[in-house]
């Protein structure tokens, strides 16, 4: 249920992952809204609704599917990562951006990028290509992409 941290309204929402009650979060304060969803095996319509009308998004771009398939993980781990209860791939995020993204968010943070099964540049290029292929090319550059990192802070936005 909804809770507050000072004036910040936080709305948890259910995501698909193989954990006990996994959630993403939607944040609202003074007319600014954002959402964060990592550890998501799929980006379904229910999650897409929580991401709508946000000024910024932080979404998982965990892996390149081919890198997982040829990588060193045991088969059962590969199957888990690639499943709808695993992690969101670059391609799955790109599909969301091309087909379900409402284009309100001006900033998209690519998050939870696997060191073993992804490359930040591949994740970035996949998302950028999806935005550029959108049917409304004038909007392609209206959403700025940002990489997040496991060992250092990301940029801070002044919204």
Locations of regions flagged by a protein language model:
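Cofactor-binding loop segments of dinucleotide-utilizing enzymes, especially the Rossmann-like FAD-
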Residues: 39, 113, 150
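Short, active-site-adjacent cap segments at secondary-structure transitions
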Residues: 3, 116-118, 153-155
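Residues at the C-termini of beta-strands that transition into short coil/loop
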Residues: 14-16, 60, 149-151
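A generic structural signal for short, non-catalytic loop/turn and secondary-structure boundary residues
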Residues: 3-5, 138-140, 150
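Short, basic/aromatic-enriched C-terminal tail that caps enzymatic domains
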Residues: 143-159
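Cap/insert and terminal regions of metallo-dependent hydrolase folds
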Residues: 45-146
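Core dinuclear metal-dependent hydrolase active-site scaffold
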Residues: 1-56, 156-159
